[in-house]
Every structure is written in structure tokens, then in C-alpha cells.
């Protein structure tokens, strides 16, 4: 049983993808199960549409997901050039909304046979994406936190007040879409260890 999830706002396009996949699965006598979008992390293959805020640091999760799941990007052809500056997304298979049925079917055969991406996306590829929206001071703060410094120590090292440092930390957390300090520290530990080598 192949579990598939599609996160796409255009319901007509999503329905079209499901028809193509169902037809192919029937030809191969392969059973597929379409999961709801909120269960995308449990799917074997996930189709992810680029939303309006895809420029954010959200793509840092791609290397982690591709260790156990094939991810494919749904986007417009005009996004292709922008994707070149997001190597973690550019490495994934793409389905363009402008593709005709024949082209989507051709791409889908590779995706469903899991030949579209041979290896997981390496975690090092995301360094630029993850930190591109941070100021120099924010990067410095992240590096100090990743090194294990407490807030009061980082404030002193950055020549800032504790209140300014807290404000800076909140700004970083917003950019990373994390809400609690525990999530923030876990995020740094899991995704930003590369800061220590800089």
C-alpha cells in the first residue's frame, strides 16, 4: 500500500493528480491510499505546493523529510528560476501546474516508482535557506545560543540589553515559525549545528 498526501489549494489540480495516479496504480495493480493534507508527514510520497510564504525558512525541513519520504513540489513554471536559489527545493521533482496531462503522467511514473529522487536531500544544502532572512546580529545571536550561551551572556557579548536580546530572539523565532523556547532550542540543535563550524 502506497500512502500519498497532496497539499495543494487548487482542488481541481489536486483532483486531476489523483485521477492520473489512480489510473497508473490500477495499471500496475498497486494499491494506493490518499491521506488528508494534515497527515502529510505520514505519507510515503508527499506532493507539496509552494504557498505564498515559501521564501521563508520553512524549507529547512526538507532534508529531514526526504530521509523517509519522497517529496515532490507543485508550482508554476515561473517559479523555476527562483527555486534555483533554494537548492533543497530545487533538488526535488517538480510538477508544474502548466504541464499537460501527458507530461504530468510521465513525471508521475518516475515519482510513483520512487525514481525521481535517488537520495535524500543532504542537510548541509539548507544552510543558506535557513539563515538568509537573518541580520548579522541575529546570526551572531543564533551562533552564541547554538554554542550554549545563556541569554544574559549573549546580551553581554553582543553589547545589548537583555530586553533587546529577548526581542531579537523573538524576531528569529517568528522567522523560523517556532512558538516556544523549547521548540526554538530543539530547532537550533537539530538544524543549525552548522553554525558552530562557521
Swiss-Prot record:
Main subcellular localisation: other
Location relative to the cell: Fimbrium
Entry's Gene Ontology BP terms: regulation of DNA-templated transcription
Highest taxon listed in the record's lineage: Bacteria
Pfam families referenced in this protein's UniProt entry, alphabetically: GerE
Keywords for the protein's UniProt record, in alphabetical order: DNA-binding, Fimbrium, Transcription, Transcription regulation
Xref: SMART domains: HTH_LUXR
Disulfide cysteine pairs (residue numbers): none
Protein name as catalogued: Fimbriae W protein
Species annotation: Salmonella typhimurium (strain LT2 / SGSC1412 / ATCC 700720)
Amino acid at each position: 500500500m502506497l500512502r500519498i498526501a497532496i497539499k495543494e489549494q487548487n482542488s481541481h489540480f489536486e483532483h486531476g493528480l489523483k485521477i492520473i495516479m489512480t489510473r497508473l496504480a490500477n495499471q500496475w495493480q498497486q494499491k494506493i491510499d490518499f491521506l488528508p493534507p494534515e497527515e502529510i508527514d505520514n505519507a510515503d510520497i508527499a506532493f507539496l505546493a509552494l504557498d505564498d510564504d515559501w521564501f521563508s525558512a520553512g524549507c529547512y525541513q526538507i532534508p529531514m523529510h526526504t530521509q523517509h519520504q519522497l517529496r515532490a513540489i507543485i508550482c508554476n513554471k515561473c517559479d523555476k528560476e527562483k527555486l534555483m536559489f533554494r537548492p533543497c527545493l530545487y533538488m526535488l521533482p517538480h510538477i508544474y501546474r502548466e504541464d499537460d496531462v501527458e507530461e504530468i503522467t510521465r513525471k508521475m511514473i518516475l515519482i510513483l516508482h520512487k525514481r525521481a529522487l535517488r537520495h535524500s536531500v543532504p542537510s548541509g544544502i539548507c544552510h543558506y535557506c535557513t539563515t538568509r532572512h537573518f541580520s548579522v546580529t541575529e546570526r551572531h545571536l543564533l551562533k552564541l545560543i547554538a554554542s550554549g550561551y545563556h541569554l544574559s551572556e549573549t546580551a553581554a557579548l553582543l553589547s545589548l540589553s537583555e530586553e533587546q536580546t529577548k526581542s531579537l530572539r523573538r524576531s528569529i523565532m517568528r522567522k523560523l515559525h517556532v512558538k516556544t523556547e523549547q521548540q526554538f532550542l530543539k530547532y537550533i540543535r537539530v538544524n543549525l549545528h552548522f553554525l558552530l563550524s562557521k
